[in-house]
Amino acid sequence: MVYIKQIELSHFKSFGGTTSLPLLPEFTVVTGPNGSGKSNILDALLFALGLSSSKGMRADRLPDLVNSTYASRSRSTVETLVTVTFALDDWQPEAEETEEGEGTGLQPGMAEWTVSRKLRVTPSGTYTSTYAMNGEACTLQQLHEQLSRLRIYPEGYNVVLQGDVTNIISMSPRDRRQIIDELAGVAQFDRKIEQAKGKLEAVKEREDRCRIVEQELIEQRDRLAKDREKAQKYQALRQEQATKQSWEAVLRWRAGQRQVQALQRSLAQLATDAATDQQTQQTLEQQIQQTEATLDRLNQRVKALGEEELLKLQAALAQQEAEQRQSQRQQQELVESQTQTQQQIQALLQTQAQLQTEGQQQAEQARTLQTTIAQTLQPQYQQALEQVEAARQSAHALAAQSQDWVTRQTSLRQQADAIAAQVEPQRAEQAQLQERQTQLQQQLEATQSALVTVTAELETETEQAEGDRAALSQAEAAVVTAADQLVRLEEELQIQQETRDRLLKEQRDKQRQLDRQESLRQAMQETQGTAAARLILDTGLPGVHGLVAQLGRVEPRYQLALEVAAGGRLGYLVVDDDGVASAGIELLKQKKAGRITFLPLNRIRAGKQPEIPRWQQPEGLVDLAIALVDCDDRYREVFKFVLGGTVVFERLDQARRYMGQYRIVTLDGELLETSGAMTGGSIARRSGGLSFGSPDSGESAEVRAIRDRLEQLEVILDRSELQILNLQAAIKDAASTLSDRRQQQREQQLTVQQRQQTLQRLQQQQQQLNAELQQRQQQASQAQARLAALALELPAALKQLKTLRQALAELEDSPIHGEWQQRQTLLQQQEALLQQQETALRQAEQQLQQLQTDQKRLQERAIAARTQVSQLRQQQGEQLNRLAQLDEQQRQQATAIAQLQQRQAQLEAQLGQEKVDRDRTERQLQEQRSQRQNLVWQQEKRQQQQQELQQQLTDLEVQLQAEQQELPQPLPDIPEMVQQQGIEALQHELRSLAKRIQAMEPVNMLALEEYERTQARLEELSEKLTTIEAERTELLLRIENFTTLRRRAFMESFEAIDRNFQEIFAHLSDGDGSLQLDNPEDPFSSGLNLIAHPKGKPVRRLASMSGGEKSLTALSFIFALQRYRPSPFYALDEVDSFLDGANVERLARVIRQQAQAAQFIVVSHRRPMIEAAERTIGVTQARGAHTQVLGIPQP
């Protein structure tokens, strides 16, 4: 808990010397006689902490705070020093504070923190005041910054003086509301709003500058647009001229090309003919050669009887037959494979049947065996068991007859059996221990191996668990971050929605205001006649010039005088003639739109104007009214009619001398008629009235402000709606992200839990293996020790057993022993038979179990056989498909073989015609040789013609090559119509274009580039203006959001303080009270009223209460403020002075209750307050000199 631990005063006011006042964190009352210096302790707090000026410490100047006795005795510099020590028990800085690292400031872990202030006063009356923290100098601002960390504020109510209660009572409601403004931090929002408005003004200035530049660029662009249009036309004509000139050159060149092509075609035709003849000749030569070869071949074929072709056909036929055989082999293989598959299926089916049969047989065997066991083996075993029991009883009877022999034999046998019984278990135990030791060694090795494995797994899982826990921490941090983001977005959305709702309400209110103003304006227009004029002007009636007020202009200093002189005639409508006026009157009648006076220019006649010679001008005369109007000459008669012969004087006293001589108006608006009537007094310039230069009843500044605000609200609301939509989308995304992060967190938690379970399981396994290892080691040690003991005990026991058995053998040689031996032999035989029967029974049971196992194995084999049968049948289906393909292939091969065989038969039939063909070929050879001779004669004639055409082609190509170098590259595309019209029409168009181009010159060709540059600058500026507009809208929305936050902060503070006030007032007065705003809808233009309802009295406002009630209400308000923003200490100076005893008791109880959370120092001399205090400090003056303090024991 933070509290004031000590106050040290040196020469402060009534305190002489140095006085230390220790304090405790409790309810302390400072009491004493009037004038003893009680309140000076609180003044010392205000002085040291810089919470008040000298006026607040009841001093005119700071030097008055120095002890007067001390100051009067000393002729040198005097000083006063006050030091306040704070105890910082358990104090920690707020989470949002940043540590500055300064030694003088508050630091975590400090036990105490001191603040001091020294005032030095020189003999001349000048003074210096210095503050210090922990003995180091600081500024007042630095001190207040550190005090604010302790929740001690200059504007707070840590120290409440008598005047503070009175101020609460006497201050205006608006000032009282400003107290809550300070606590709510409204000033901070006001600073933000002002900063935003400053930025908005800067943005507006930038926008205005850009608008000016934009207007200049638009004007420049419009000027350049005309030059650009002419330059574009000129450029198009020049381009068209160049294009058509290129067309002309191309057409000339193409005409030459066509001539070249014609010659080339002729040459080509000759060459083609020559080539054709040559080809024909070559063909004839080839035909001749072929015919000769054919003739030779026919001769040979006739001799050879066509053997070669027949061989080829036979080879092809053999190939087809080989392929057919190959297909048949494949088909055969598939058939065989299919057969094998079918055989495998049959074998498997047989196997299935065999397995089924074997299963049935084994089942039958099992049933038979079960019957044998139940009906034969089990009864035989019971019978043998009964016989063994009978033999044993007979042996016992024989033993009773030969008691001595039996006794001795029994004794020896018992001894031998006892030793054997002792030895045999030991030998068996030794064997078991040896086997056990071997098993334990193996188990130890296995356990150690398993322990190593589990330990390695445990280390791996531990590392993974650490990683999982780190991932879980990250997932939890991500969830917190996503949740904070969602909360921030929702808070911002709520602010935006509140701002939107508030602006919508303001928009509706402004619209209603505008509607009321419009209604008033319309009503005023109707009374002035301008409504009818507006109707005439809006209909576009020809011949209407406008209202008289629109057609003239005057200087502002004469405007009032001339408007008074003109009066209602400013609302007359000027038209061309009386016909237009008649049509306007008819229109008003039809529309029932009221009446108006028309002034036809062809009919209007003004009266005679007074003439005042310049040398006779009266004192104070300004001029004739008509001379002060600036208008078009055609409206001069109109204004003479409107103003009449009115003259303008400066003042009324000057005009009165000429009253009755002229119609006079003064600059202040007094009107003096020639009839003697005088009009004057106070004049109100009504909004909406007609004035010179206004088109109609202009809008008032209030209406324009409302319209501007409505436009601004429309822009801000659009931006706000966009922000709300964006925030809603962002909230949706943030909620989705938060859900995903939470799901990841849950998954990670599940992973960590599973990993923890795995770790626990491995740890348990490790513990079990360790315990098992220890147990095995202990068992091995025990077995080893027991084996060592047996190695010592067994040899002696075996020797004794041998001796006993020899003695027993000698005894058994007697006759009694023979009979005993027979009985024993019979018993052994029957026991052996019993053992055989038992063995047979056990074997039968094992065989039955084996049969059951075999039945299970047969079932598994049957299932496998069924699966294999299914696979083989699938393979069989694939083989059938392949057989069908091979059948189709064999049919095609058979068809090909049949065709080859048919051809072979035809060739064999044709061999008989070979001789006839040979004779026909000889005649053909003679005709071909004759054609070859005619072609030789035609070739010689064509060669001569070709040489003449080649010379013409060479000359024309040289000419075209020179023209081709001047052609544009690539060649332009010439329209089909131009090609059809010909080169003469094109040359005519070129001459016409040349004349048009010459007529347009000169042309500003730079306008093309300048226009584009200007347009680019204008587009860039438009983008910049769009950005500035968005920035301005954003600033407007920010201002509105700050306004929303300011109102929210105020209302939250107001509502909290109101709740505190109601609770505290109920304790102080046994009544109820509340805080009330004059206008809750607009709290910042409202005042704050304290409404109280003391018990048994009607509800009253603060002004109508008694003095005590006012004090209680004001104190309740102060305590409500303190509770809203708590501080570590409070000091009250005689706040109970206006209260009666009962109210002082209630006040003391409230303070004692409040003191549980903060330190209270109360200056009072009222008994109920002193009795309620936990500690009392007395203040007195020693012999009227200095104030002294002392502790008073509590009763």
UniProtKB/Swiss-Prot annotation:
Pfam families in the record: SMC_hinge (PF06470), SMC_N (PF02463)
Source taxon at top rank: Bacteria
A single Gene Ontology CC term: chromosome
InterPro entries, per the entry: P-loop_NTPase (IPR027417), RecF/RecN/SMC_N (IPR003395), SMC (IPR024704), SMC_hinge (IPR010935), SMC_hinge_sf (IPR036277), SMC_prok (IPR011890)
PANTHER family listed in its UniProt record: STRUCTURAL MAINTENANCE OF CHROMOSOMES SMC FAMILY MEMBER
Family as reported in the entry's similarity comment: Belongs to the SMC family.
Name this polypeptide is given: Chromosome partition protein Smc
Underlying gene: smc
